[in-house]
Amino acid sequence: VCDVAAAGMMEYENRRLGNDAVWSAPYMLVKRSLLIRRTDLETLKEPQDFQGKTIVVTPTSSAHIDGDLRYKPAGATIVSFVPSQDEIVSQLLSGLIDAFGEGDASNEYLAGKHLDEHGERLLVLTDLHSMETPELLRLAVRSVDARLPAAINEFLERTQRI
């Protein structure tokens, strides 16, 4: 039995938790971003800059939806296959791909993890934006005992980051 599931989940109308679970209050607002090489920052700033470029996204994710809606019409190729984040970063740094679409927190983590010999970031975020429906991350909480969701929501209110 799992009491709390946390995996960057957003409440969608068609994402049902069943009778014994509820969504928590939101704990984080995600902005969409593209992770790119630092050397490309001056030329890759907005959707039209990605014409002819390759953007990798996780299949069926918010990044995939965003890629199809925001960058594909501008002429970008959207590739929805992620063998691993390490492999995607390797492809990005070697120039095999041009960007990795993710939420800002995930891409910020990757950018901070890959530094040059001077401690400077090799990767940076660009085109940070919210989707039409704001992405509010929530926890899936077992609700057999109503005290658990109440306690979690109380904690989230005290530590609000939105």
Q: Positions of the model-derived regions?
A:
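A ligand-binding cleft/hinge motif common to bilobed small-molecule-binding domains
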Residues: A6-G18, D66-R70, I97-T133
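Non-transmembrane alpha-helical segments in soluble domains
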Residues: V89, L93, G101, P149, ...
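Acidic, polar ligand-binding/catalytic clefts
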Residues: V1-D49, R121-E132
